[in-house]
Amino acid sequence: RRHILCYDDSPAVLDFVGSERAREVAMVGSACPDHLVHTKHWPLFVDWDGVDVEGLKARLAQEIARYREAYLRYVETHRSPQDPIMDPSPRIVLIPGLGMIATGRDAFMAGVARDLYHRAIAVMHGATALDRFVSLTPAEAYAVEYWPLELYKLTLRPPERELAGRVAVITGGASGIGRATAYRLAQEGAHLVILDINREGAEAVAADLVARYGEGRSLAVPCDVTDEAQVAEAFRQAVLAYGGVDIVINNAGIAHSAPITETHLEDWDRVYNVLVRGYFLVAREAFRIWKAQGIGGSMVIVASKNALAAGKNVAAYSSAKAAEVHLARCLAEEGGEIGVRVNVVCPDAVLRGSSIWDTRWREERARTYGIAPEQLEEFYRQRTTLKVNVFPEDVAEAILFFASDRSAKTTGGILTVDGGVPTAYVR
């Protein structure tokens, strides 16, 4: 089961975990019976010298395994035959010099565990200042944690959604396909990190996702995908906010249309910087995280019909999109050994809500076809086999398929969402 993590290095936490008697006091037990449901009776306390990071990683894995075994022994000692067995993973992890990591089924519940343990720290400080800190016995703690009425409340929860506990990073998430994808993944329980060069747009999407789906459900990070440092910082913020990354939607967009003789070098470089360099930088950072996490991942590259079919007056854009498709194939080969899947969605003519189509791109494409800009939607509809227009929500459904376990055995694949364009049929 996947959890969302909440990291806390506040002064109160660092002072407590760094104190001489921190382990002794913390392992006495919970500070309040009401906390048990959210924090468990005991935290996981992991000693660390503050220097050996690789050693800490190895020790964390070992200590979590030991904690789970100890929790299962505690349950088996006190449970009745009809009692369920809760998730044995720790809810609170304390590490001297680093702070506290709280966990939960989503960001809100991880935040609840964090806040409750702050209160526990205050209680432990107060008790030890006056005398000593005492808690419930294991039997008493079990009776509270597995109280029948509390167990009944758990049965009233709605079933977990398909992407519950997963974190998705979306580039170009402030508008168009990226925005629609953020909402679709959120509907399935994902936490969203919205990356976009448009800070206000990204913040608006993230704020609306939080309003709709709950506290902590989304984070906005302004990011120029062509900037190596900004990409690395964006992923760092995602990991600090939620504990890791599971899904990456490589979607940042730009477009340019002109005959090759009128395509300036700066135009060519600008398109390739976003669509090739940017997609590479995002993919590289994602792979670094996935390799460290060791639990796989899923990347969806949003290419274009133009990656598969030659087009007039779009040499820079089309060739860059073709490069994205082959990048995805190469990444799929590298990702297989670490459980990472990489797939491609190729949409076409998604005009609604797109920041690209609100620029000169619309006029340039209309000029290429010899029609007025306002005629583009109907022109694109008529040229499709199905005689339909394609909307951002249509593409979001295809992205969800590749991002989720529905496509668990597919990598290196291409899914077109174009209404049927014969020249772009995948062969």
Language-model region placement:
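Short, small/polar-rich loop/turn modules that mediate ligand/substrate recognition or access, typified
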Residues: 249, 336-341, 410-412
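Active-site loop immediately N-terminal to the catalytic Tyr-X3-Lys motif
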Residues: 258-261, 309-315, 337, 387, ...
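Substrate-binding pocket helix/loop in short-chain dehydrogenase/reductase
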Residues: 259-260, 264-272, 362, 380
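Active-site helix of classical SDR
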Residues: 283, 320, 328
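Alpha-helical segment proximal to the catalytic Tyr-Lys
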Residues: 288, 333-334, 408
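Residue(s) in the substrate-gating loop at a strand-loop-helix junction
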Residues: 304
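Short C-terminal tail/terminal secondary-structure segment
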Residues: 399, 411-427
